[in-house]
Amino acid sequence: MEYRSLTLDDFLSRFQLLRPQINRETLNHRQAAVLIPIVRRPQPGLLLTQRSIHLRKHAGQVAFPGGAVDDTDASVIAAALREAEEEVAIPPSAVEVIGVLPPVDSVTGYQVTPVVGIIPPDLPYRASEDEVSAVFEMPLAQALHLGRYHPLDIYRRGDSHRVWLSWYEQYFVWGMTAGIIRELALQIGVKP
């Protein structure tokens, strides 16, 4: 697939045809969810945030809107939608959820479910001053180009762990966020 020519229809048909295989086994029992917001355009965008430098965990990192599932959430999808509204003012009613990717175990002890949703192009994003320092949109075709991600093998607590690294403009995209974007690319059939 030529990544420069990815349309929203191409993305949707590939995502719907190749449904993710969900592995129910997990090392972590605390649940979290992130929204992967795909901006509805002829050439779609991928909405990302940069976390505030004042946060205790993952300060300054590029991330999808999301967080822990709490007692008021009916599901991981509800948690992702709630967090997106809290962090960047995306109303849950504006998100067309098209599916989820397999959960990812985080280094902070959460099982994170990526929820894929389509959002309108004209939403007035407002970053939560406490949690988000920037909101930006990356062309989806560029985000899903696997050649932009570089592996780094690190050792943590005696175990080898692979993280993925990339840049977009002034933003350093790495770790779980880069891994989720790569998983989305693989899910729609992009070849390494």
Curated annotation (Swiss-Prot):
Binding residues annotated for Mg(2+), in chain numbering: E83, E87
Essential cofactor(s): Mn(2+); Mg(2+)
Gene Ontology biological process: nucleoside diphosphate metabolic process
Domain Nudix hydrolase: 29-160
Name under which the protein is recorded: Uncharacterized Nudix hydrolase NudL
PROSITE patterns in the record: NUDIX, NUDIX_COA
Function: Probably mediates the hydrolysis of some nucleoside diphosphate derivatives.
Family the entry assigns: Belongs to the Nudix hydrolase family. PCD1 subfamily.
InterPro entries: CoAse, NUDIX_hydrolase-like_dom_sf, NUDIX_hydrolase_dom, NUDIX_hydrolase_NudL_CS, Nudix_NudL
Motif interval(s): Nudix box: 67-89
Record-linked CDD domains: NUDIX_CoAse_Nudt7
Residues annotated as transmembrane: none
Superkingdom as given in the UniProt entry: Bacteria
